[in-house]
Design a protein with these regions (language model features):
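Conserved nucleotide-binding/hydrolysis modules and their immediate coupling elements
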Residues: 180-183
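Internal glycine-rich, Lys/Arg-flanked active-site/core loops of soluble domains
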Residues: 29-176
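Intrinsically disordered, low-structural-confidence terminal and linker regions
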Residues: 1-31
Length: 183
């Protein structure tokens, strides 16, 4: 599984994750420090993200903001940051999200500086989940959803599996992170 095809189709009715906007903006090291017990070798991946992130950059992101996007896109084992974060965002235990608030604040302030995407983006899952959705259905994905403007990118991740589902999403307020990712 990767961040382009990670999806939860349980349609949970969860309350929003209120509160992260009001926490202090801190460095990526400080934001992720409380998660080091949950994510193996996290401090190593933070160093890699800070080394290779796009800084300086055209959108005036700080090094920590740029690294917060970069580390989200990094793939490593089952404890990749995006997997653990999205698992927490999908959890019914909303209190467990508080440990993520400093990172979410940093990540959100970074995304706020990036261009907004309006129009068609693509997402896929290597399972046939089409029966769980209807045309024009509105629902909330309780996770950070990586998409691509190119259907070919998503098809590559799906590897031509017969039972795959390809989503065409009409984005209203997406963020273009290309240029800030590991790829």
């Amino acid at each position: 599984m990767n961040r382009f095809s990670d999806i939860d189709w349980s349609f949970k009715k969860l309350p929003p994750a209120y509160g992260f906007h009001s926490v202090e903006l801190v460095s990526i090291d400080k934001a992720l420090q409380p998660l080091e017990k949950q994510i193996k070798e996290l401090s190593r991946y933070v160093k890699i993200a800070k080394k290779y992130c796009n800084f300086p950059n055209e959108h005036n992101l700080s090094k920590d903001q740029s690294a917060s996007i970069y580390i989200y896109t990094m793939e490593w084992q089952e404890t990749s940051l995006y997997r653990v974060l999205n698992e927490a965002l999908r959890s019914e235990d909303r209190e467990s999200l508080k440990i993520w608030f400093p990172y979410l604040k940093l990540f959100d302030t970074a995304l706020d500086r990036l261009p907004t995407v309006k129009g068609v983006v693509w997402r896929g899952v290597a399972l046939d989940v089409g029966k769980n959705f209807t045309k024009d259905q509105a629902f909330t994905w309780w996770a950070v959803s990586s998409c691509s403007a190119s259907v070919n990118v998503i098809e590559k991740f799906l590897q031509n599996k017969k039972d795959s589902t390809l989503f065409l999403i009409e984005a209203i307020n997406g963020k273009k992170v290309s240029g800030y990712t590991q790829y």
